[in-house]
Amino acid sequence: HVGLVGANGEGKSTFLNIVTGHLQPDEGKVEWPGKVSVGYLDQQSTLEKGMTIREVLRTAFQGMYEMEQQMLDLYDKMGDATPEELDKMMNTVGEIQSELEHSGFYSLDAKIEEVANGLGLGSVGLDRDVSDLSGGQRSKVLLTKLLLQNANILLLDEPTNYLDVEHIEWLTKFLQNYEHAFILISHDITFLNSVVNVIYHLENSNLTRYTGDYNRFQEMYAIYKSQQEAAYERQQQEVAKLEDFIARNKARVATTNMAKSRQRKLDKMEMIEKPREKIKPTFRFNEARTPSRFIVEAKDLVLGYDTPLTRPVTFNLERGQKIAIRGVNGLGKTTLLKTILGLIPPVSGKVELGEFLQPGYFEQEEREKNEKTALEDVWDEYPGLTNYEVRAALAGCGLTNEHITSKVFVLSGGEAAKVRLCKLMLKDINWLVLDEPTNHLDVDAKEE
């Protein structure tokens, strides 16, 4: 039960894409033994419109349904078969029947409902069209389907994003009892500590294996780092001494052989790489002028699109208040934010905004595929800044030069979130509206 950890942009999702064959490695090869079944939850998977949740979940057992169809086809053909053919068909049907019973085919619907309820899909309704679901609910459908496949190895990329607390608890128990292997990417430390017994740490394109949970890894990593730094310093001192000796003695006849000997020693030395400082992001928001006392006044507000999502609500938001909005997925938290910001109209009721308001809105996800580089994306929004200033702002959010010059749509979820945070930080703001800002962010970025 492996936890794959590392800062945003180190290549965790890329690693999973390489081992699943979605990307080609630059060198080397990936081999899976023939009978190993692999289940992959990718951050960016999509669902087909027109299917219900139940129909999507049943596709987890596609192979079994195909076997059942093969058996039914054989029954249809039996009426026209010769005695010899009939014998063969009966044998094949018996084998299929036995395989289906052994695999629990006849209790699949109960199994589907058990896992769907565990992740909170029961309350959504399994007969709903997947195109009607919120982003969080779609993620739950994909995760449920994956868990139902009972693969020999699960590859899970941030499975707790969009899960409510009770469903994270259910998933924790499920993974603790999972009889097969899994590789898990997660920035939720409590969750990681509960389910993994091995950590693979990805840093500077190197994978290092640690046994134990995330806390144990942190202890071991701190020791390893200090040993690396000490070894690097010792070697640098030795190199300096050798170079000094060579420079002073290579020209003198009496000592030239000793100088050559030292040069050979220096040439053979395996150089220790200087430990790289981890880039830590800093998030600071520019404050605009002070707004009026009341930021938002909502009266008899009903949220929704075509149909109401809520009963009428009345509330005030005052300057200086720090408010958290909680509730299960699909209840309308994002809709509430968009309604009070004036991005979508309420079904009924009214919203009044205060004076001198300059909101900064962080959306959960970008809707369109962003073809711009991170540099272009920020610069287009702030054309008055110099190239250096835009690069400095992005670097301050923990992005490297490689990220800054990459197209936004190829960045990992965490890197893309940092680009959006960067744009917010360059704006004068007196009211922050943040929709799941820490989804995809690594541990350091979350803390900061």
Where are the regions that the model predicts?
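Post-kinase regulatory C-tail/linker adjacent to protein kinase catalytic domains
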Residues: 283-285
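Intracellular alpha-helical coupling/juxtamembrane segments of multi-pass membrane proteins
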Residues: 220-275
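ABC ATP-binding cassette signature C-motif
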Residues: 1-230, 279, 288-448
